[in-house]
Amino acid sequence: MPAPAPISSVQAEALRTRSLPPLEEVRHGVWSLSSTVGDRVEGHSFSYLVEGSDGSLALIDPGWAGPDAVPRLEAALRSVDHELSDLTLVVVTHLHLDHLGAADDVRRASGARVAMHALESAALDRRAADGAAADADVARWGAPRELTEALVASWGSGRALPAVTPDLLLADGDELPVAGRRLRAVHTPGHTAGHLCVVEPEQRLVFTGDHVLPTINPGIGLGGRTASNPLDDHLASLRAMVPLDRPGADALEVCPGHEYRFVGLAERAEALVAHRADRTLDAVTALDALRAEGAGAASPTVFEVAERMTGWRGGLRSMTGFVLASALAQTEWHLRSAGRADELATD
């Protein structure tokens, strides 16, 4: 299925030219602004300002932390006749640095409250324990020794996460405290356990963070350990998007965390579900081939299965660090979802 067409020509052009798009009005009282991810313009993230009927503002995803984060926000606010003191709420869709990073800086500068899902807050609190457990995952995957140090550094105990304590914990269905707005939190686990989308039904907008993007297939399980399978969570969250959308003029406009705004939430969610089904089949086919070739031999490792899969762009051996770790974790989750994880090596 082709990628959805962009609603914003400005954002589409910035994506094409690898430049940073300017502040843009999405609807009356709603603006998008962009920020670099570290020093990189490519892959920039979006924040969204939403104005309440009393003149207060909510900020959805403050973006990457850095010396220019608050001055950039302050300049954007001035351009729409607001100031930092108008900001009363910072909503975090998920715990990644390109979305959450500047939350503390913005809170200190404005006095705004920071809100996130309770599971994201819990993941931040237990990041040390999760990192140690992830080190054990790396060992179990069976990657070559020369790759394991980078895997631990990027996925396990060496991975950096911010220390942010929220003022307000959100749950599925909660209405955000923005005057005159019906902004509703929708819990969409998968990318991370406490990922949130925010729906504005009156203006037919949905802010999707990294849950649904127009061309990128979002990673899963990237927010700490969970008792459930992140893949199964992700699929359920994608399917939950479909009934939110409507055909024609009442369709939701998707305001994602990256790339560009678009219409076609239901179709894009269904395409992502289909993509995951293809990946599950790829993993099962690779496992079957390895077991057929090695009948009576030791069970294959996660790395061996992933290396045999055909869906990786450039092949598994082209990956290192975090990207490789994510691929290996996803391989295991696909096999777990298919009921085949017990056929993998466990040590």
Predicted feature residues:
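Short Pro/Gly-enriched beta-strand edge/turn motifs at strand-loop
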Residues: 4, 27-35, 154-159, 179-181
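Metallo-beta-lactamase
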Residues: 57, 64-67, 156-161, 165-168, ...
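C-terminal regulatory/interaction regions
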Residues: 2-12, 16, 285-347
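Short, leucine-enriched amphipathic alpha-helices that occur as contiguous helical runs
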Residues: 112, 276, 280-284, 328
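Conserved beta-strand hairpin/beta-sheet module of binuclear metal-dependent hydrolase folds
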Residues: 23-80, 197-214
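Residue-level signal for inorganic ion chemistry
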Residues: 29, 258, 283, 338
